[in-house]
C-alpha cells in the first residue's frame, strides 16, 4: 500500500479557499459562522472541529507603491493549513479508547463512533489541530479523506485546488518534487523559501509538509514541535528508579530491625 501525503506550496496559493469549501462539502462539516474578527481578512482564523482545512492569510511588511498615485501596499502570503498526520502522533498515543488509528496510507484517523470526548488528544497535539465539537464533546480533524483514498480518489482539497498549491500522492515522490521546487525558487532569487517538515523533532516528520517564504512560525509551523507525551517517558523512568530506591531502603531497614 502506498504511503501518501500532502505537499503544500504556499508560493502558489492564491487564498481562494476552494480547498476549505471542498473539504466542507465532501465531509459534510458544519458551518463555522463565517464572521470577520477584525484581526485579519480571513474569516475562519484557525483549524478547528468545523474547519479541517484553513487558508491562512499572512500579512508581510509594507512595500512602496510602484509609482504615480499607487499607495503603499502590504505584502501577502497565503498557505492552506491542515492536520500534519505526524509519524509520531501525540493524539494517537494519548487516546485511551483506541478511537484514533493509523491508516494503511499513513494518515491519522479519528473514529467518531468510538471517541468518548475525553479531550486527551486535544492537549497532546503540538499544532493545536484537534478540536472538540461543543455539541457532543467528540474530537474532529482532517480525515486525510480516508474514504476517498480507499476508492483510489484524490482528497477533496487537493482535487479542488486551482493552482496545484496542494499536491497529493506518494510521500517519497512529493519530497522529491519539493526538493526540485525549492531549488528552482532559490535559483530565481527567492532565497527565503524553505521546506518545513520537522523530521528531527519528536513528531518524527509529517505526512503534510509545506514550502513557505520567510519564518515558518508565521504560518503556524513551529521550528521544533514536540509531543507532550515524550516528557512522560523519562519522568516515569525517574519515578520508577526513585520507587525502587525507597523500596530497597525500606527492605534494608526491615532486615536490620529484625536483627
Identify the meaning behind each predicted range.
Residues 1-259:
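Non-ligating segments of multi-cofactor redox enzymes
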Amino acid at each position: 500500500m502506498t504511503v501518501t501525503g500532502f505537499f503544500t506550496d504556499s508560493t502558489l496559493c492564491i487564498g481562494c479557499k476552494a480547498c476549505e469549501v471542498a473539504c466542507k462539502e465532501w465531509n459534510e462539516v458544519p458551518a463555522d459562522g463565517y464572521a470577520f474578527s477584525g484581526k485579519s481578512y480571513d474569516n475562519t482564523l484557525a483549524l478547528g472541529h468545523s474547519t479541517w482545512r484553513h487558508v491562512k492569510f499572512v500579512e508581510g511588511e509594507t512595500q512602496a507603491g510602484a509609482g504615480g498615485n499607487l499607495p503603499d501596499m502590504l505584502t501577502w502570503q497565503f498557505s492552506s493549513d491542515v492536520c500534519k498526520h505526524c509519524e509520531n502522533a501525540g493524539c494517537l498515543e494519548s487516546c485511551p479508547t483506541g478511537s484514533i488509528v493509523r491508516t494503511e496510507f499513513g494518515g491519522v484517523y479519528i473514529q467518531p463512533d468510538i471517541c468518548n470526548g475525553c479531550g486527551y488528544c486535544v492537549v497532546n497535539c503540538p499544532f493545536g489541530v484537534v478540536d472538540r465539537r461543543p455539541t457532543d464533546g467528540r474530537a474532529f480533524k482532517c480525515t486525510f479523506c480516508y474514504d476517498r483514498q480507499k476508492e483510489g480518489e484524490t482528497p477533496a482539497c487537493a482535487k479542488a485546488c486551482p493552482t496545484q498549491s496542494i499536491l497529493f500522492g506518494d510521500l517519497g515522490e512529493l519530497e522529491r518534487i519539493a526538493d526540485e521546487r525549492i531549488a528552482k525558487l532559490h535559483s530565481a532569487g527567492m532565497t527565503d523559501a524553505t521546506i518545513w517538515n520537522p523530521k528531527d523533532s519528536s513528531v518524527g516528520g509529517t505526512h503534510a509538509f509545506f514550502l513557505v517564504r520567510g519564518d515558518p512560525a508565521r504560518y503556524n509551523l513551529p521550528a521544533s514541535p514536540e509531543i507532550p507525551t515524550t516528557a512522560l517517558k523519562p519522568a516515569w523512568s525517574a519515578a520508577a528508579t526513585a520507587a525502587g530506591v525507597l523500596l530497597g531502603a525500606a527492605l534494608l531497614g526491615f532486615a536490620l530491625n529484625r536483627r
